[in-house]
Amino acid sequence: MAYECELTSADVKAAAKRFGADLCGIGNMERWEGAPKQNDPRYIFPGAKSFIVLGFRIPRGSLRGIEEGTLFSTYPTMGYAALNQVWGPMVMWPLCNYMEDHGYEVVPLINANGGESVNTVTGKFREGWSRPVEEGKPHPDVLVHFRIAAYLAGMGEFGWSKVFLTPEFGPRVRFVVLLTDAELEPDPIYEGHICDRCKQCVKHCAGKAISMNESVKITLAGHEVEWGKLDEMACEHGLQGGADKSKNPFEAEYPRQYGYGRAIEGACGCTRACMSHLEERNKLTKTFRNRFRDPKKPFWTIDRSKPYEISQEVYDYYVNGPGLEDHKAMTEYNAKENYGSAAAAGISEAPSDGGKVNAAGLTYNPMLD
């Protein structure tokens, strides 16, 4: 079949914006040269010539409830999961169809954990997770680093926190990636500077996960990239509200926090403090009529030295009863119902502390798996 015209980068970007993306960057596949085999998208689509990265703004208002300490559900839903698993895929579908109608193949990669052979938290290879289907190929599934993809597509830079910053939204962006055999004009690597090394991300991180002085340096497409050394597990612990109880209003005996996914802390340093700082310094192109945070107003903190009375009803249902949001009940649910059977999940019994190593050699954590 003959096609009337070739798609250009401008065509793709216009379509992406029309379908609902806030940002769109494009790179050529050669920019992935030097990537570890388990993270190299060229093994996913060897015929790909270009990759497309779509950016979706995190609504600033989705952070407001945690900022005020009064609503903790909006950020993990509207600012997190809904962007990664609902809106991002909904925009990719029509873009894939649009490009297919012009004769191009497109591989959509959604920003959600799947069966990656690389641990998405620590970045370590999962021994025994899967087998290569042919000699020389990586273990399935290949894990593409979306922030690196955004950098290679010229969309911004890494901040000290390792969170990706764009000139438009700063840290308030989530990404999806598409691989295509369309040969598109790549965007230049971003040469500007958004992060001014203020280290507000370090000072305000509840998990104390970001080093103040130690850094990591890597080379991407011939450019040296640097960010602060990150303790990934401290980040996980802090994000879930377990590091600084003065920033977590929920009681252990009444752990509705499990219904909030993984964002109790609300990205206090790497997103909220960073965003507020960049806005105050007029570093971002997308502006607001009112400031996000009054720098003179102290941030709320909980005095846990005071006794807190837990009602008998809470004890009966959540501690002594079968309430699903109890830690043990949630663990058992994930081990059996969510996977079909405990055996299928490689788990012999529900761990009492969320830290049992299963048959695949993975640490099983109901907050992550």
What are these regions (language model features)?
Residues A35, T77, A81-D294:
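Catalytic cores of enzyme domains
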Residues R291, I310-L362:
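Long, compositionally biased charged/polar accessory segments in the mid-to-C-terminal portions
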Residues I44-F45, E127, I302-D303:
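Short alpha-helix boundary/capping motifs
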Residues K296-R304:
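Eukaryote-specific, cytoplasm-facing alpha-helical/coiled-coil scaffolding segments in long proteins
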